[in-house]
Swiss-Prot record:
Homodimer. It comes from Pseudomonas aeruginosa (strain ATCC 15692 / DSM 22644 / CIP 104116 / JCM 14847 / LMG 12228 / 1C / PRS 101 / PAO1). [2Fe-2S] cluster binds at residues 117, 120, 122, 128. The keyword Secreted does not apply. Residues 117-128 are annotated as: Might be part of a sensor region. This is Redox-sensitive transcriptional activator SoxR.
Length: 156
């Protein structure tokens, strides 16, 4: 007999099915403190209905590349005992948009710097610590320094 009461709790299987995640993902989220459950008399996990929306927030955030540690920090700012509201989502997504924009900008810069290495191929350009950080021979300029012009080994 199904309980139609809006406040009823969800089993781990129900929550997994409704959220579109594996049961193991819910267990993982719980061990990371992203969601919580109560145990019933039979020692089975029971999740509040609000947890469904939290899992959806986790999934969306993960899909756009937000690290779980960031998601956990964000979820800690939400009040317990209620589903995240539209205002909660607006606040979280605004912060995540800022972070994503910053990461995208960094990735675009890295991509553009990487293009400069294609012609050289030696990965010892002194202009870019990304390509070869701490290069001992970078003071001698770009290019391979252990080979002479004909490609023979050279005593450094």
């Amino acid at each position: 007999m199904k309980n139609s009461c809006a406040s009823r709790e969800l089993s781990v299987g129900e929550l997994a099915r409704r959220a579109g995640v594996a049961v193991s993902a819910l267990h993982f989220y719980e061990t990371k403190g992203l969601i919580s459950s109560q145990r019933n008399a039979g020692n089975q996990r029971r999740f509040s209905r609000e947890t469904l929306r939290r899992v959806v927030v986790i999934k969306v955030a993960q899909r756009v590349g937000i690290p779980l540690a960031e998601i956990a920090r964000a979820l800690q700012t939400l009040p317990a005992g209620r589903s995240p509201s539209a205002a909660d989502w607006a606040r979280l997504s605004a912060q995540w948009k800022e972070d994503l924009t910053e990461r995208i900008d960094k990735l675009l810069l890295l991509r553009d710097q990487l293009d400069g290495c294609i012609g050289c191929g030696c990965l010892s350009l002194q202009a870019c610590p990304l390509r070869n950080p701490g290069d001992q021979l970078s003071a001698e300029g770009p290019g391979a320094h252990w080979l002479d012009a004909e490609g023979r080994e050279h005593d450094g």
